[in-house]
Amino acid sequence: MTPLLTLILVVLMGLPLAQALDCHVCAYNGDNCFNPMRCPAMVAYCMTTRTYYTPTRMKVSKSCVPRCFETVYDGYSKHASTTSCCQYDLCNGTGLATPATLALAPILLATLWGLL
């Protein structure tokens, strides 16, 4: 073998192999769900979608996806939904903010502003 080919082979053997992403994959009628799984190699994102049927009733879905389209609200359907994506192992383990929590944010900011 030529020295250049030998050098290329040595360098390639030292490179780490691409690691598959680990995501929580589940569907749950309630606040949150956890089920860690190894995703296929082509997957680039962990996704969490929450569909709100009423302010207190929701469905949480978590999955592995090759592409992500984050949404805050789908105005065309009769149910509100939020979708978020992330790109590191088990990053979709935490839940998204619920509507009640989001409603408290302006009140908290106004209170803090009044204290300043």
Curated annotation (Swiss-Prot):
GO biological process terms held by the UniProt record: acetylcholine receptor signaling pathway; regulation of neurotransmitter receptor activity; synaptic transmission, cholinergic
Keywords: Cell membrane, Cell projection, Disulfide bond, Endoplasmic reticulum, Glycoprotein, GPI-anchor, Lipoprotein, Membrane, Signal
S-S pairs: 23-46, 26-33, 39-64, 68-85, 86-91
Signal peptide per UniProt: 1-20
Pro-peptide region(s): 92-116
Pfam families reported in the protein's UniProt record: Toxin_TOLIP
Membrane topology type: Lipid-anchor; GPI-anchor
Superkingdom to which the source organism belongs: Eukaryota
Subcellular location per the Swiss-Prot or TrEMBL entry: Cell membrane; Cell projection, Dendrite; Endoplasmic reticulum
InterPro entries xref list: Ly-6/neurotoxin-like_GPI-ap, LY6_UPA_recep-like, Snake_toxin-like_sf, Toxin/TOLIP
SUPFAM superfamilies: Snake toxin-like
GO cellular component, one term: endoplasmic reticulum
Note: Isoform 1 is considered to be an endogenous 'prototoxin', that shares a N-terminal three-finger structure with snake alpha-neurotoxins.
Protein name per the record: Ly-6/neurotoxin-like protein 1
